[in-house]
């Protein structure tokens, strides 16, 4: 069974967004997101990023689709003509996973939001890990990360993951990996 990971940055009140944007500006965290979701061990493959409609359109137009990754948008209201060529439209996460299982060009699959997609993904038996950036501050948010089930446990960091508390623009944050155990 093909599995996936989630990647998210959350503040102390589990907020992840405000008015379709990120509530904070942390360049090094965005670079970490980009590097992590692009990294493959096989140079002939790429990774997929799976997101809901609001998350896709929340990415600045100049930066979407997210480069060097297969972008998959989950929506039952969009048409293929609403998205650029090369962006895959699927009605739900399981359909996207079945399509990805049929081809051999994708190495890693990353769930990148939003709230409803994260919730569905964490409940799935396909869910492997949650890469979470814990922002040690509260921000005004209107979109929140769902409660993390007890089946997730912290595991050792990846070799290229910055360790310990980081700080940028007066905002402290830390990278963690949680793995789902059955």
UniProtKB/Swiss-Prot annotation:
Annotated DHFR domain residues: 3-180
CDD domains: DHFR
Gene3D superfamilies, alphabetized: Dihydrofolate Reductase, subunit A
Annotated residues for binding of NADP(+): 9, 15-21, 53-55, 75-77, 113-120
Pfam families in alphabetical order: DHFR_1 (PF00186)
Binding positions for substrate per the UniProt entry: 29-34, 69
GO cellular component annotations of the record: mitochondrial matrix; mitochondrion
Functional pathway: Cofactor biosynthesis; tetrahydrofolate biosynthesis; 5,6,7,8-tetrahydrofolate from 7,8-dihydrofolate: step 1/1
GO process annotations (BP): dihydrofolate metabolic process; DNA replication; folic acid metabolic process; one-carbon metabolic process; tetrahydrofolate biosynthetic process
Oxidoreductase listed as a keyword: yes
Catalytic activity: (6S)-5,6,7,8-tetrahydrofolate + NADP(+) = 7,8-dihydrofolate + NADPH + H(+)
Gene Ontology terms, MF aspect: dihydrofolate reductase activity; NADP binding
Function: By interacting with vestigial (vg), may control genes involved in DNA replication.
Family membership: Belongs to the dihydrofolate reductase family.
Name the UniProt record assigns to this protein: Dihydrofolate reductase
Lineage, highest ranks first: Eukaryota, Metazoa, Ecdysozoa, Arthropoda, Hexapoda
